Amino acid sequence: MSGTLRLEGMTVSRGAGPVVRDVTIDIPPGKVTALLGPNGAGKSSLVLAVGGVLPSKGKVLADGVDLHGKRPEKIRAAGVAIVPEGRRMLRGLTVGDNLEVACFALSREDARAGRAHALELFPELEKRLDALAGSLSGGEQQMLVLAQALVSRPKWLLVDELSLGLAPVVVKRLVPTLRTVAESGVGVLLIEQFAHVALGVSEDAYVMDRGRIHFSGPASQLREQPELLHSSYLQSGKAA
């Protein structure tokens, strides 16, 4: 499909051996795609490899153009935005300054438009622009890192563990925003340990465990047939 980010045959090694083995995932435009799996499945390693942070084998095809092996800034410039696990930001700077840093590669006009777009998605941050990022609540910090990723108006957005450490009410606020982003034409990959967080907003889903894909298909199939989670996602007997 035109506009798709395709991760093809990705293998990632850390330490003694591979933690991701020959994984292929399609992230089409205008949809939220879920990547599910237990802790240690290799999901975060895959995302870091896509972003050019970890060495890997395979292809990262952005609308047919292979970005594999490119430097992180080249990958971002091609329209791939990644929100890694852990809510990484400059905690000693204000919210406004963090957004300015995220705009460093943009023209003045694009930076102004991107910032306005991000604050439209997360109006809660408008009142906190002068607050230090480190003083924000966990939910506000997650909004900030999402806003930082979105100021550049990416074609694809990869979000790792959106719900980690957040109260359910905060997650309920954030997840629909990803659907709004997708409806604007962005291809969104939502990586989650907790299946229920991602399945409600996703159209397609992949289940990963021990570095391999064990299920790929419509998210509705996992919602309607929860036993599939127990046979693929829950090989270790743990439910999410």
Please give the residue ranges for each predicted region.
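Glycine-rich phosphate-binding loops of nucleotide-dependent enzymes
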Residues: 2-240
